[in-house]
Amino acid sequence: MTVARNRAGAGPGKGSPISSFADKTFTDPARIRNFCIIAHIDHGKSTLADRMLQLTGVVEERQMRAQYLDRMDIERERGITIKAQNVRLPWKVGDDEFVIHLIDTPGHVDFTYEVSRALEACEGAVLLVDAAQGIEAQTLANLYLAMEKDLTIIPVLNKIDLPAADPDRYAEEIAHITGCEPGDVLRVSGKTGMGVKELLDEVVRQVPAPVGDPDGPARAMIFDSVYDAYRGVVTYVRVVDGRISPREKITMMSTGATHDLIEVGIISPEPKASIGLGVGEVGYLITGVKDVRQSRVGDTVTAARGGATEPLVGYRDPKPMVYSGLYPLDGSDYPVLRDALDKLRLNDAALAYEPETSVALGFGFRCGFLGLLHMEITRDRLEREFGLELISTSPNVVYRVVMEDGAEHVVTNPSYWPEGKIREVYEPMVKCTVIAPSEFIGAIMELCQNRRGELGGMDYLSETRVELRYEMPMGEIMFDFFDALKSRTKGYASLDYEEAGEQQADLVKVDILLQGEAVDAFSSIVHRSAAGAYGGRMTSKLRELIPRQQFEVPIQAAIGSKIISRENIRAIRKDVLAKCYGGDISRKRKLLEKQKEGKKRMKTIGRVEVPQEAFVAALSSESVGDKPKK
């Protein structure tokens, strides 16, 4: 089947987009279909999107590249999707022409907010499952999000060309979860393109057309915004009511800010300016604004004159769950780091940061992230896109501390831990869902119990796969829980988590003292039962990392004034007797006494300089979790 291509306009010259009937906007809503793909990392979502781009003819063969919609280098390198992307595709069923908007969403748990926003812009979702691996925990979480929003679900098994594929078994599993028949599950291969045409036909058949009032006041929901160095903020919207045209004034309903619309257009899959957008259409707006916070994701855009009074539901500020300090290795890079964070914030509304100083590390920023992957990717982007060298302190969650006198403190950094009598401490909890082969139940239960988890329930998805639900403190899954889970289940387990309030816990702050002085960068908040292990681990690690001095240096771990662990760095001894070739013993004794006095004085006034490498090594190995020593 070929797509009608109107070549009267732009000819398919070098880099020029192929024009088709989908390039005309104000399409009749009955001929529009909006859908997204829900899938776990590595289940072939971006590859399937690539095949759709080729099949509908919007990308020429010679311009095709793998993961076409993943724009960032880091997305392509890690093979993951971070930002939600969208594309407008032409499709014909018989003689009927349809416009399909595909919104490509991230699959990782940290980016659930990006997924929920993309779902708001759709009426249907393709549930994509790897035919060799089956459904994963995060896919399940995103599927439930889609079901809550009443989207039409089209179940699909991908990678059926793999020798290890077992489509019949996993079709049963999907049918069990979605309530459809195993025969209704479509089978495709994103790699070979098999079954993709049938999938697009099903999207047209099953996904409902968008509904909205074409004559009402304009209302459009922002589901993403990116920063372009030349054009300012590019805002991606889905029009719900009315129409949006260039050269008119628009208002953002959450902030009340008014902007001039410079350009309105569609993505197919490169941006193309258009005469406007109508009901159900997905496209982009450019207002020339330079700050992405002006166009918040989930906000409602309306006309400045005669606009809507009621915003669309669905906007909430993303809340950081994990905090970590970011410091430049070279102190003079601080302004560069500040500018870099400002620029990243333009693309990433979920990133929060404020300046902070550390005695040990100098000037830096306390940054809030959605999760550990978000933190790692932000750091990667800072280093790669802005050429910075950074130290990040070990991540921690937000604690609420209540003092004896009833005063409350919110602690995002161990150095803000209040002094004095503490009545109670509350820590954030998460509900974890682990899906794994049933032979690993014992290993998973043991791991979760060691991390202070409570079993909430257990379901068999099929005879061989089981879903375990745990409630755990978020601080316990922060470091290496995912690594430990993967190693205990030979890589077969998948994990998803969501917030679940807070609980009271017996938490303490462990300080690391060098020569009696606390080093703020190494402080950590841990459960009392794990404090001894943390203290012992850090002191022995620092003993190896800090260079020896002319005097003995004690490294101690302490809770308040109580020392729980100690290691000593032996002094370097200079051979003061080297110049005495023989001679009187009293002469030697005098030199040794003098050395002893000098060492004593040095010990009282000497300072221990901790080299940057020691900080980097201690903090980085700490944050990835300590592997048991072989």
UniProtKB/Swiss-Prot annotation:
<dbReference type="Pfam" id="PF00009">
    <property type="entry name" value="GTP_EFTU"/>
</dbReference>
<comment type="similarity">
    <text>Belongs to the TRAFAC class translation factor GTPase superfamily. Classic translation factor GTPase family. LepA subfamily.</text>
</comment>
<dbReference type="Pfam" id="PF06421">
    <property type="entry name" value="LepA_C"/>
</dbReference>
<keyword id="KW-0342">GTP-binding</keyword>
<dbReference type="InterPro" id="IPR038363">
    <property type="entry name" value="LepA_C_sf"/>
</dbReference>
<dbReference type="InterPro" id="IPR035654">
    <property type="entry name" value="LepA_IV"/>
</dbReference>
<dbReference type="InterPro" id="IPR006297">
    <property type="entry name" value="EF-4"/>
</dbReference>
<dbReference type="InterPro" id="IPR009000">
    <property type="entry name" value="Transl_B-barrel_sf"/>
</dbReference>
<feature type="binding site">
    <location>
        <begin position="158"/>
        <end position="161"/>
    </location>
    <ligand>
        <name>GTP</name>
    </ligand>
</feature>
<dbReference type="InterPro" id="IPR000640">
    <property type="entry name" value="EFG_V-like"/>
</dbReference>
<dbReference type="InterPro" id="IPR004161">
    <property type="entry name" value="EFTu-like_2"/>
</dbReference>
<dbReference type="InterPro" id="IPR035647">
    <property type="entry name" value="EFG_III/V"/>
</dbReference>
<dbReference type="InterPro" id="IPR031157">
    <property type="entry name" value="G_TR_CS"/>
</dbReference>
<keyword id="KW-0378">Hydrolase</keyword>
<keyword id="KW-1003">Cell membrane</keyword>
<keyword id="KW-0648">Protein biosynthesis</keyword>
<dbReference type="GO" id="GO:0003746">
    <property type="term" value="F:translation elongation factor activity"/>
</dbReference>
<dbReference type="InterPro" id="IPR013842">
    <property type="entry name" value="LepA_CTD"/>
</dbReference>
<dbReference type="GO" id="GO:0005886">
    <property type="term" value="C:plasma membrane"/>
</dbReference>
<dbReference type="Pfam" id="PF00679">
    <property type="entry name" value="EFG_C"/>
</dbReference>
<dbReference type="GO" id="GO:0005525">
    <property type="term" value="F:GTP binding"/>
</dbReference>
<comment type="function">
    <text>Required for accurate and efficient protein synthesis under certain stress conditions. May act as a fidelity factor of the translation reaction, by catalyzing a one-codon backward translocation of tRNAs on improperly translocated ribosomes. Back-translocation proceeds from a post-translocation (POST) complex to a pre-translocation (PRE) complex, thus giving elongation factor G a second chance to translocate the tRNAs correctly. Binds to ribosomes in a GTP-dependent manner.</text>
</comment>
<keyword id="KW-0472">Membrane</keyword>
<dbReference type="GO" id="GO:0045727">
    <property type="term" value="P:positive regulation of translation"/>
</dbReference>
<dbReference type="InterPro" id="IPR027417">
    <property type="entry name" value="P-loop_NTPase"/>
</dbReference>
<feature type="region of interest" description="Disordered">
    <location>
        <begin position="1"/>
        <end position="22"/>
    </location>
</feature>
<dbReference type="GO" id="GO:0043022">
    <property type="term" value="F:ribosome binding"/>
</dbReference>
<dbReference type="InterPro" id="IPR000795">
    <property type="entry name" value="T_Tr_GTP-bd_dom"/>
</dbReference>
<dbReference type="Pfam" id="PF03144">
    <property type="entry name" value="GTP_EFTU_D2"/>
</dbReference>
<keyword id="KW-0547">Nucleotide-binding</keyword>
<dbReference type="GO" id="GO:0003924">
    <property type="term" value="F:GTPase activity"/>
</dbReference>
<protein>
    <recommendedName>
        <fullName>Elongation factor 4</fullName>
        <ecNumber>3.6.5.n1</ecNumber>
    </recommendedName>
</protein>
<feature type="binding site">
    <location>
        <begin position="42"/>
        <end position="47"/>
    </location>
    <ligand>
        <name>GTP</name>
    </ligand>
</feature>
<dbReference type="InterPro" id="IPR005225">
    <property type="entry name" value="Small_GTP-bd"/>
</dbReference>
<feature type="domain" description="tr-type G">
    <location>
        <begin position="30"/>
        <end position="211"/>
    </location>
</feature>
